[in-house]
């Protein structure tokens, strides 16, 4: 393939479908220094749609590792007011926000888990208003990825750097439906299909889901009254439709924070802030994790669960068929953006207010009353695989087959 041409199309897809950049709109991009060449294409695509300005905030995993090594927990947990103000100013101006991920999935392995937690919690507290705006769809936002040597070599260690880098680009573009002549048109069709699935679930007015599989998962997930099933397209208050994740294969909603019970096992490793957690399980009672275990990344999982009261409860339930483009690659990307779109998943932490009627206009207290979970974190992990069965229940006890053998029933 002509990679340069393909990457230009991918950048245009991100700007047009992902962010849906409007004339005169500012754009803020967060990206790794390793993705500089692709970021330039995205910046140009945004300007071509009429962006007022496109600002880029760079991050570097090696520098992050040094900061975690040498700074104190107190220093790591402190975020300057100037940084908070920068994001608030962008929000006030109606900006669109883009995050381009691509770091080595295990690049922060070995760092002090207490320092990592201090850094994560400090940033989450400081950026709470921004994250509330994002999760309420008050502005357009999108998370995408770009190939880097560090990530590619983790997936294809047998290849040299260049071959691995190119192979990962090939997989990313394929998973993102960006290899054809008109990716934008292809995405319009894809969104329609997901909207139909969401409509089916919404019309059944389910009150509970029962999830089982051969890994040992046996989980009941209660759903709040007036919950909404969302799909690929979102609608910002100040803009037209945007797509928050490219790729996306999911239909998702808000669980009731107090109504999850049973046990769940992960189906794929979880990459949490540059550290892999794997072969783990969580036991729930009355919505809360009461016991857990992990063969890899136990301390990081423990710190995640101890972030706050809401980090032991779930804020998202997402349905993804096992027979999906990303799952069918049989590649473990070690990156949640991709792996969550290869399997059904749940998220520990904060719920999306958009998943309940009137949610974006509710106060935190009102959201809690209807069953929405609140937390500083929102961390997806994969629970679905080829043997996953999901049955829905209506208020009058009727059973609705949702998934059988990993796919839509």
Describe each PLM feature range.
Residues 365-409:
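Extended hydrophobic packing segments that form well-structured cores
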Residues 222, 292-293, 403:
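Short linear motifs in exposed loops
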Residues 291-360:
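Dual-mode signal for accessory low-complexity, basic/Gly-rich regions
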Residues 259-261, 277-279, 286-289, 312-316, ...:
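Active-site lining segments that contact anionic ligands and/or coordinate catalytic metals
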Residues 12, 202-204, 273-275, 310, ...:
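Short solvent-exposed loop/turn micro-motifs enriched in small/polar/acidic residues
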Residues 1-261, 392, 398-400, 408:
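Active-site bordering "gate/hinge" segments
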Residues 251-309:
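Long, well-ordered mid-to-C-terminal structural blocks that present hydrophobic/aromatic surfaces
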Residues 109-112, 153-157, 232-234, 275-278, ...:
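A short secondary-structure junction signal
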């Amino acid at each position: 393939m002509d990679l340069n041409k393909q990457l230009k199309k991918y950048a245009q897809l991100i700007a047009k479908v992902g962010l849906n950049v409007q004339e005169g709109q500012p754009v803020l991009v967060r990206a790794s220094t390793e993705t500089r060449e692709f970021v330039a294409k995205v910046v140009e695509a945004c300007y071509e749609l009429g962006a007022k300005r496109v600002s880029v905030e760079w991050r570097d995993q090696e520098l992050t590792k040094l900061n975690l090594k040498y700074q104190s927990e107190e220093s790591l947990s402190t975020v300057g007011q100037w940084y908070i103000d920068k994001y608030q100013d962008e929000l006030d101006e109606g900006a669109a926000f883009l995050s381009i991920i691509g770091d080595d999935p295990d690049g922060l392995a070995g760092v002090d888990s207490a320092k990592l937690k201090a850094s994560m919690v400090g940033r989450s507290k400081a950026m709470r208003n921004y994250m509330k705006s994002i999760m309420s769809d008050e502005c357009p936002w999108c998370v995408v990825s770009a190939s880097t040597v560090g990530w590619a070599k983790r997936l294809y260690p047998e290849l040299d750097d260049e071959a691995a880098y190119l192979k990962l680009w090939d997989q990313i573009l394929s998973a993102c439906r960006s290899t054809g002549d008109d990716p934008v048109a292809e995405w319009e069709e894809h969104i329609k299909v997901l909207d139909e699935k969401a409509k089916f679930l919404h019309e059944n007015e389910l009150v509970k889901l029962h999830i089982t599989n051969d890994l040992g998962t046996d989980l009941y997930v209660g759903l709040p009254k007036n919950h909404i099933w969302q799909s690929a397209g979102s609608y910002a208050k100040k803009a037209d439709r945007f797509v928050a994740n490219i790729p996306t294969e999911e239909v998702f909603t808000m669980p009731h924070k107090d109504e999850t019970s049973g046990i769940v096992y992960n189906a794929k490793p979880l990459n949490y802030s540059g550290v892999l957690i794997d072969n783990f399980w969580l036991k729930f009672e009355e919505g809360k994790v009461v016991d857990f275990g992990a063969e890899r990344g136990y301390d990081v999982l423990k710190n995640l669960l101890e972030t706050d009261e809401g980090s032991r409860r779930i804020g998202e339930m997402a349905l993804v068929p096992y027979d999906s483009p990303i799952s069918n690659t049989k590649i473990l990307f070690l990156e949640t953006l991709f792996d969550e779109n290869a399997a059904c998943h749940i998220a520990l932490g904060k719920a999306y207010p958009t998943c309940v009627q009137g949610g974006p206009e509710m106060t935190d207290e009102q959201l809690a009353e209807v069953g929405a979970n609140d937390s500083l974190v929102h961390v997806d992990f994969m629970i679905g695989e080829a043997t996953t069965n999901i049955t829905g229940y209506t208020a009058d006890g009727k059973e609705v087959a949702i998934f059988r053998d990993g796919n839509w029933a």
